[in-house]
Amino acid sequence: MINEIKKDAQARMQKSLESLSHAFGQIRTGKAHPSILGSVMVPYYGSDTPISSVANITVKDSRTLQVVAFERNMLGAVDKAIQSAGLNLNPTNLGELLLISMPALTEETRKGFTKQARSAAEDARVAVRNIRRDALGDLKKLVKDKEISEDEERRATADIDKLTKDAEAQITKATEEKEKDLMAV
């Protein structure tokens, strides 16, 4: 019973960390990275499809992405989708592929992206704390129903607190790394 609560809390905290990592992947740094285009949806046979399903995205050099559509006739649609995605990116259509040069980040955009990163980190921290609260509530319910003793509850609470502390440390570390990437010129 206690192990199930701990495993559930750990799995949910891990999902929060993965969600944070995904959110950080969407925040553009000065370097080219395929995950920047992760949110781009391309109209494909009547439905919006993720760009990764209709094109291959590779890093040509540190500031350039190369996009090759799986179907040549889709290149125009991919081009329009990238331009209209609100990422401030302008692809260059070379007929068979698109080249996307990453514009240098201004100090203002760097600060904006840093705020965005901090906000995502705070959301992850709140999620981890909520998971902790849920797990502790489940433990209290077990004590109330006399399924576990108060000593077992204290030990389990200490374990859950350790999981929470570890998750928050990982969030802090990831946030510091992202901020360092963003502020590097």
Swiss-Prot record:
Keyword Protein biosynthesis applies: yes
Compartment(s) where it occurs, according to its Swiss-Prot or TrEMBL record: Cytoplasm
One GO CC annotation: cytosol
UniProt KW keywords: Cytoplasm, Protein biosynthesis
CDD domains for this protein: RRF
Entries under InterPro entries matching the protein: Ribosome_recyc_fac, Ribosome_recyc_fac_dom, RRF_sf
Transport as UniProt keyword: no
UniProt cross-references to Pfam families, sorted A to Z: RRF (PF01765)
GO molecular function: ribosomal large subunit binding
Transmembrane segments: none
Biological-process GO terms, alphabetical: cytoplasmic translational termination
Chain's role: Responsible for the release of ribosomes from messenger RNA at the termination of protein biosynthesis. May increase the efficiency of translation by recycling ribosomes from one round of translation to another.
HAMAP family assigned to the protein according to its UniProt record, in alphabetical order: RRF
Family the UniProt entry places it in: Belongs to the RRF family.
Protein name per Swiss-Prot or TrEMBL: Ribosome-recycling factor
Organism in which the protein naturally occurs: Pseudomonas fluorescens (strain SBW25)
Organism placement in taxonomy: Bacteria, Pseudomonadati, Pseudomonadota, Gammaproteobacteria, Pseudomonadales
Gene label: frr
